Amino acid sequence: IEIENVKKHFEDLKKKYSNIIVEGAGGLYVPLIRDKFYIYDLIKMWNLPVVLVCGTKVGSINHTMLTLNALKTMGIKLEGLVFNNYKGQFFEDDNIKVILELSKVKNYLIIKNGQKEISDEEIETFFN
């Protein structure tokens, strides 16, 4: 990956669209250029806010809190949390509750298992 090429394409997209979603597939510490440039570098380079997609299964509390701590330490703005693949299990409800209590994040969405769309109203509420 050549960073200058990525920058150029991003600038071209910004001219064409008012909103752009940049997916940080795999997480903050995934290398885009091994040992040189990571997903978090890309986020910081463009000063992008983050919507953190979280699981709800066992281990989600630790994983989410570690990532939130890393975002805070790096000075990266969190837009909110999206709890993905929610199946309605009692432990998922508890995990979501604990994450929200520990993180003090107020802005979140819950995406149910198999849910294909998010309503315009949900998106408006999330980003405003």
Where in the sequence are the language-model features?
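Active-site phosphate/pyrophosphate- and oxyanion-stabilizing loops and adjacent acidic/basic residues
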Residues: 40-41, 97
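Short glycine-/polar-rich loops that comprise or flank the Walker A/P-loop
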Residues: 46-49, 77-78
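ATP-dependent carboxylate-amine ligase catalytic core
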Residues: 1-37, 44, 56-65, 69, ...
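A contiguous pocket-lining binding segment that forms or flanks enzyme active sites
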Residues: 49-55
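C-terminal lobe/tail of nucleotide-utilizing enzymes
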Residues: 68-128
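Structural motif
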Residues: 21-23, 51, 82
